[in-house]
Amino acid sequence: MIKHLLNNRIAFWVIIFHILLGTLSATSNTVIIGWFFIVILFETPNIIDRNKLNIKLNNAIVYLVSLEVLARMAKTSPFIPYEVSKYVMCALFLYGICLNYNKGYIGLLLLALILPAAFYDQSEAVSNELLIFNIMGPIDLALGVIYFKGQVINKEQLFNLIKLALYPAISVLAFAFIRTPDYDEIDFSLSANFDTTGGFGSNQVSTVLGLGLFLTFLLWICGKIISKNKLFDMVIMMGFVLQGLLTFSRGGMIGGAVAILTLLFLMTFSGTRLSATNKINLPRVGLYLIPAMILGLLVFQFVDSLTGNNLSLRYKGETAGTLAGSKELDLNTFTTNRYEIFLGDVELWKDNVLLGVGAGASKALRPTTEEVPTAAHVELSRLLAEHGLMGLLFFLILLIFPFSSGNKIKTL
């Protein structure tokens, strides 16, 4: 099933299919539920066959996990359970590890660092559901390090994985676009906008749209035309920018922009030698960057005008309070109280340096000025507060390990 989505001869129609998938899911969740289980039904015997197992597993993991946000937007629970992607990843990683006899010692170390926090809770308020919600993500990361240990992914396989992550993002874009009312009916204030996200969480939708922007740009700059039509690819890319800006959730668009700039920096200044078989054409960097920046700025200006200049105020960190003079524009205001949450996590870590307060416990224990406890929005501070020194080591290993591994690779 998934291999047909990677057939370049029908690439345009694969994108049209995913646009229709998002459009129809906006009216009935039966569509995405049916598609999700059709993919599982056809892929299960495919991955049981061990021929080219890693390639098939990688494709299944990326595509099924990428469908989750669309499923959440369409409110498919309990048919497609909440957080299903974490369980799918865990199951498929374990399947691949067992069949391949992987021994990723770095991943085992990560597991050893993250698991202890599951066995204590200083808040005495962490339910089993909350515990699993908080611990499964880091566990999947550790299992992923073990699973991918020793795998060689060539350029073609990498681009296929990028496409499989991009297709569901296009569906999310279509869903949000269809559910967005007429712009004249939307009250654009200086906070995240749920009208332009299909009524779903603006942070999650904005993140997917920012990821879609980055992946589209990555394929574009590497000379890979997604739909076999350059103009259509450009429309998709600008669609991600337009809808992402309209969410008024800054993280997704800023994250996408930072990812693009980081990519260009690495492509320009990397000292890695390029092989003839997997060469990425570096001279195209400037050729693609300049028109992309111009179009991006034009879209930003259009959306800013559409929202009565509220978009530019939002990205400056202004709120109704700061404009009225009743609130000071500082780092905490600019980050929508995330800085205060970060400091609260650091305070918890100071009091529990070695082990932290336990997985999921920081929400109830964090000292903030908010009446309702808020979940952490910065993964580093959550790791420090809940896992202590072991959380810090977990983060540092994840940060350093890819670069140390990359030094051993002589070609791209």
Give a label for each model feature:
Residues 58-66, 232-238, 378, 398, ...:
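Loop-to-helix entry and N-terminal half of a specific, functionally important transmembrane alpha helix
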Residues 186-188, 196-198, 322-387:
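Long extracytoplasmic/lumenal interhelical loops at the membrane interface
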Residues 180, 246, 264-327, 347-351:
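A membrane-periplasm/extracellular boundary helix in multi-pass inner-membrane enzymes
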Residues 22-34, 73-82, 128-133, 200-206, ...:
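Helix-loop-helix junctions and helix-breaking kinks within/between transmembrane helices
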Residues 2-98, 116-124:
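N-terminal signal-anchor transmembrane segment
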Residues 118, 143-144, 159-187, 200-270, ...:
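Alpha-helical transmembrane segments of multi-pass inner-membrane proteins
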Residues 79-93, 106-150, 163-173, 208:
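Aromatic-anchored transmembrane helix interface
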Residues 47-55, 98-107, 219-234, 274-281, ...:
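Membrane-interface helix-loop-helix junctions at transmembrane boundaries of multi-pass membrane enzymes
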